[in-house]
Amino acid sequence: MNNSYKNYNSYNSYNNYSDVGGYKSLPFFKQAEIIYDFTVEFVKRYIDYKSRTKDQMEQAARSGKQNIPEGYLQKSLEGRIKLLGVARGSLEELLNDYLDFIRQHGYRLWEMNDPEAKKVRAFVYNNYNNYKNYNDYITSADKAANVMICLINQTNRLIDQKLRWLEEKFVQEGGFRENLFKKRMERRRVY
């Protein structure tokens, strides 16, 4: 295990990180966190440290993770939808960086039914899905990139589902400002 992640599990246990509700319990947040950590390690190993791609991949992975809690903590559905959309866009950008890496290096892209792809996709359904599940894959550039392609695709699908749900909720219930305005108008009628 890489030194930078040696204490990863003890950190999570110490802070009761995995037991916290809210956005930290969202499967796509957990996956975005793994994607970010894995990407930081990936670019250290396989992308030239002077390359602009290194910075862009790290920033896209970070944005994919960080916009989830920022959006989740918004009072308005519009804010949640917007920031979750930003997270989704960042992960799509990162997905394309990994696809470019595979193509530019002449590596084989795993097909959806490839045994390795199925194994990686199964990690997501594990209650203990965390960075160490993916640790064996970081030692090979082509496997590491393929693993992230699988995980990002899964995460994007989950975010898309959440966005559809939030959009439907917005249509049914209205937005934060709209509801505040209704409450204000009701109060005026009472007084």
Task: Name each region found by the language model.
Residues 1-191:
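Amphipathic alpha-helical assembly/interaction segments
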